C-alpha cells in the first residue's frame, strides 16, 4: 500500500495511420469519428515518478471516467489518496467536484484566455511576484475558490514562454490579450504546497508527453485489416514499456538527463563488427558514460567481444535487480 499516487492525464492526436480497411474500422473499439485519432492516457505514478500502470482513455475524459480511474488506483495499489494532474479539459469543474467528494486532489492547468476578469487582472498585476535574479522567470500564488472548493492558484511567467506565445499568436484571435503572453496558470487543491512543488508536479504532464512524442514517428501502418483503436492501443503499450524503461534508467541516473537525451544516446550506442569476434562501439558522450555507469558496466570501453557484450548485459541485469531490492 502507498500513501498517495499521481494520476496524470494526457491526450494525443496522431496523423492517419493508413491502416488497411481503416475507414470501415474507424469506429471499432470506441473511437468517435469526430475525434479522429485522438485518444488519452491515464498513467499512475508513484511519488518518485516511476510508472505503476496506465489506462487508455478518451481524449477528454469525463468526471465519471476520471473517478473510475481514481478508484482503480486506490483498489489496485492501496493508495489512500490520488492527485490528478491534467492540462486543458472541458470537464474541469465536474472533475474537481468529484475529486473533492472522494477526498482526492488535483493540479490542473487553468487557461487564462477563458478565465474571469478577476483572475486575468491578478495575473497581469505586477505586484507580489517573486522574480529570479536573471529576470527570466517570476511566480506568485494566491488562495481562491473553485466550484466551492478552496484552491491555490499559482502563475508562472517565463521570458521564453512570452516569446513563443507572441510568435504563435494568431491574428484572428481577438480574445487573446498580449499582456498575458508568457504566463502559465495552474490551480490545485494542495494549498499547503509551495509554488515550486506544484509546478514540479504539473510538469509530470510534460514529462509524460515527451517520450510518447518521441515514438509517434514510429507509428507505421498495419499491413492487415485492423481498427484504428486496436492499432493505437498496441502503439500506446509499446510507448508505455519504453517510457517505463526510460524512467527507471533516468532514475538510476539521478534524473540528470531528459528522455530525449537518453533515448538519442541509446540509439547511438551501436556496436559495429570489426573482425572475427571483435565489435567496435565508437560513439561516446557524457550521456553514454552516465548510462553505462548507471547500468553498472565498464564505462567508455570501445572494443568488446561477443562474450564481453553478454557479460555486460548480465551485469546490467543484476545491477538493476539490486537497485529494485
Predicted feature residues:
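Anion-binding and metal-coordination hotspots
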Residues: 1-325
Amino acid at each position: 500500500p502507498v500513501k498517495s499516487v499521481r494520476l496524470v492525464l494526457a491526450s494525443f492526436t496522431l496523423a492517419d495511420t493508413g491502416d488497411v480497411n481503416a475507414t470501415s474500422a474507424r469506429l471499432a473499439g470506441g473511437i468517435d469519428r469526430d475525434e479522429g485519432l485522438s485518444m488519452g492516457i491515464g498513467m499512475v505514478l508513484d511519488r518518485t515518478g516511476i510508472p505503476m500502470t496506465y489506462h487508455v482513455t478518451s481524449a477528454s475524459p469525463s468526471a465519471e471516467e476520471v473517478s473510475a480511474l481514481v478508484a482503480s488506483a486506490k483498489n489496485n495499489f492501496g493508495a489512500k489518496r490520488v492527485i490528478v494532474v491534467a492540462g486543458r479539459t472541458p470537464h474541469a469543474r465536474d472533475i474537481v467536484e468529484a475529486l473533492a467528494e472522494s477526498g482526492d486532489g488535483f493540479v490542473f492547468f487553468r487557461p487564462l484566455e477563458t478565465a474571469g476578469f478577476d483572475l486575468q487582472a491578478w495575473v497581469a498585476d505586477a505586484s507580489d511576484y517573486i522574480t529570479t535574479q536573471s529576470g527570466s522567470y517570476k511566480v506568485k500564488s494566491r488562495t481562491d475558490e473553485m466550484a466551492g472548493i478552496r484552491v491555490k492558484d499559482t502563475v508562472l511567467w517565463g521570458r521564453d514562454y512570452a516569446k513563443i506565445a507572441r510568435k504563435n499568436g494568431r491574428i484572428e484571435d481577438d480574445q487573446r490579450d498580449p499582456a498575458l503572453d508568457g504566463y502559465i496558470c495552474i490551480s490545485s487543491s494542495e494549498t499547503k504546497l509551495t509554488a515550486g512543488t506544484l509546478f514540479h508536479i504539473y510538469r509530470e504532464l510534460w514529462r509524460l508527453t515527451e517520450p510518447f512524442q518521441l515514438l509517434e514517428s514510429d507509428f507505421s501502418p498495419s499491413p492487415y485489416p485492423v481498427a484504428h483503436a486496436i492499432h493505437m492501443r498496441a502503439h500506446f503499450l509499446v510507448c508505455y514499456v519504453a517510457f517505463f524503461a526510460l524512467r527507471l534508467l533516468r532514475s538510476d541516473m539521478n534524473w540528470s538527463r531528459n528522455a530525449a537525451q537518453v533515448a538519442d544516446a541509446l540509439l547511438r550506442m551501436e556496436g559495429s563488427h570489426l573482425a572475427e569476434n571483435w565489435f567496435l562501439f565508437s560513439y561516446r558522450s557524457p550521456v553514454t558514460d552516465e548510462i553505462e555507469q548507471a547500468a553498472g558496466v565498464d564505462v567508455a570501453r570501445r572494443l568488446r567481444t561477443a562474450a564481453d557484450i553478454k557479460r555486460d548485459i548480465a551485469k546490467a541485469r543484476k545491477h538493476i535487480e539490486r537497485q529494485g531490492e
